[in-house]
């Protein structure tokens, strides 16, 4: 693999020499940083099993190497990356996999280690959505996830990835993560804080990542991280699990932040060792039981992961002064809910008791039941999935609901050819050789639901959302 020139400040190199265990070679560290990052993907098990995914992609000649800490994760090598970007493959467009850096799969593995089965989870800094979607898959779309993102521009990307992966149990918020300790005290079974950091571990992806690096900047970032972990710890219920992670390598933003929390709440913080998380985890293990992953250890990004348990309640923070405002949705009455459920089932949309129907004007939504306890405590950017809009003739079913709820064994499912599926993703109407009989058609490709179409004569009217429409070369190789 080709080398690339990474910018290293002298003070950074000095700091790394001091931080690196004697069992590791500093020359190996420098060499690893100069190598471009291996690409990796995670199979979305909400859509397809790992075995079926491997069978589906076998004809492509992809080399898939298992990632030891994530059984659905693989490093991927492809011969035709320039000819067809990974994000333009049919399997990516239909949500069968997520392009995710291998080391960033570690925090969720830690969160669910030792058969941990949380029902209400918060992802404090969630965009672009790799870890939120990984959490949802581990929860099998059950329970509820609060996915927060402070950056307004990234909330849209977060929602797009959640929708593409067919996730229904997520509520989105847009806050500074420091508000949650006061706003929702002791309400979560598990919390992931993948904290904003100096990004020292990402030089293999971005050779200029350290251009603005300084020890003073690290200190400022660490101060913010301490505030974030304190807030997250207050939002965690006693007995709950908190995973703290960064993609940086200095101890000030990593071990020191966790040790500060333990010093602040000595009777309430228990470090849970990660040495048994996967075979070979002990190579990155610190004396506290954290994983401090230097890039040469597993040939991935530099990363840090700590797992801790809240052993008892801690004094509450002052109640927030802000007003959340009126919640604009109301629950749908049982009789009407039954009619809606029946109509949805007729086009292949079904849901279980984890989701409940709510209404706002002519909009119908499905919210995860587990999030209802947070209503009135925080303001949501988006909650659950939009099921439909009502109109005089019935319901206008929404694309995100189709992707999350439809199953391909529906009587009205209609399998597209590769050329027809490509036309669908380009936002064009489809003219199949043999038109389906039903008026509402669940269109599938590779036996995966990709949308809902209206049959008009011999034409399938495209309903693919305009903001998702793709151009350029797609999976058939035609531009």
UniProtKB/Swiss-Prot annotation:
It is an enzyme of class 2 (transferase). It comes from the Bacteria. The active site is at 247 (nucleophile). Keywords: Cytoplasm, Methyltransferase, RNA-binding, rRNA processing, S-adenosyl-L-methionine, Transferase. Its EC number is 2.1.1.178. One of its GO terms (cellular component) is cytoplasm. It catalyses: cytidine(1407) in 16S rRNA + S-adenosyl-L-methionine = 5-methylcytidine(1407) in 16S rRNA + S-adenosyl-L-homocysteine + H(+). It is found in: Cytoplasm. S-adenosyl-L-methionine binds at residues 125-131, 149, 176, 194. Its main location: cytoplasm. Belongs to the class I-like SAM-binding methyltransferase superfamily. RsmB/NOP family. This is Ribosomal RNA small subunit methyltransferase F. It comes from Escherichia coli O139:H28 (strain E24377A / ETEC).
């Amino acid at each position: 693999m080709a080398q690339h020139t990474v910018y290293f400040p002298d003070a950074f190199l000095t700091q790394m020499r001091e931080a690196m265990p004697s069992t590791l070679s500093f020359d190996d560290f420098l060499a690893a940083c100069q190598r471009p990052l291996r690409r990796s993907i995670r199979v979305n098990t909400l859509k397809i099993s790992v075995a079926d995914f491997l069978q589906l992609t076998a004809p492509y000649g992809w080399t898939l190497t298992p990632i030891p800490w994530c059984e659905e994760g693989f490093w991927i090598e492809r011969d035709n990356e320039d000819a067809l970007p990974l994000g333009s493959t049919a399997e990516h467009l239909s949500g069968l996999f997520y392009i995710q850096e291998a080391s960033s799969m570690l925090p969720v593995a830690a969160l669910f280690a030792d058969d941990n089965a949380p029902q209400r989870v918060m992802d404090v800094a969630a965009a672009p959505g790799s870890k939120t979607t990984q959490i949802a898959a581990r929860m099998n779309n059950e329970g509820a996830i609060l996915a927060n993102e402070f950056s307004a521009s990234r909330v849209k990307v977060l929602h797009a990835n959640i929708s593409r992966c067919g996730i229904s149990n997520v509520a989105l918020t847009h806050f500074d993560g420091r508000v949650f300790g006061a706003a929702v005290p002791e309400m979560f079974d598990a919390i992931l804080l993948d904290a904003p950091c100096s990004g020292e571990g990402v030089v293999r992806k971005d050779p200029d990542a350290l251009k603005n690096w300084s020890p003073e900047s690290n200190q400022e970032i660490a101060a913010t991280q301490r505030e974030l972990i304190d807030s997250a710890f207050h939002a965690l219920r006693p007995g709950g699990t908190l995973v703290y992670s960064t993609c940086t390598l200095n101890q000030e933003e990593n071990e020191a932040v966790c040790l500060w929390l333990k010093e602040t709440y000595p009777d309430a913080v228990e470090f849970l060792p990660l040495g048994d998380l996967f075979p070979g985890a002990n190579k990155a293990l610190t004396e506290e039981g954290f994983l401090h992953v230097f890039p040469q250890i597993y040939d991935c990004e530099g990363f840090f992961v700590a797992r801790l348990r809240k052993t008892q309640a801690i004094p509450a923070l002052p109640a927030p002064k802000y007003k959340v405002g009126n919640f604009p949705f109301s629950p749908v009455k049982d009789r009407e809910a039954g009619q809606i459920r029946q109509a949805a089932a007729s086009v292949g949309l079904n849901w279980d008791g984890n989701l409940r129907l709510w209404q706002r004007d002519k909009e119908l939504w499905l919210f995860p039941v587990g999030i209802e306890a947070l209503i009135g405590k925080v303001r949501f950017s988006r909650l659950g999935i939009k099921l439909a809009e009502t109109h005089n003739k019935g319901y206008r079913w929404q694309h995100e609901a189709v992707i999350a709820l439809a199953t391909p064994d529906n009587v009205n499912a209609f399998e597209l050819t590769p050329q027809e599926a490509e036309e669908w993703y380009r936002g064009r109407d489809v003219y199949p050789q043999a038109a389906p009989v039903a008026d509402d058609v669940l269109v599938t490709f590779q036996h995966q639901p990709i949308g809902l179409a209206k049959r008009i004569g011999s034409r399938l009217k495209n309903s693919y959302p305009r903001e998702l429409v793709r151009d350029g070369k797609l999976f058939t190789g035609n531009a």
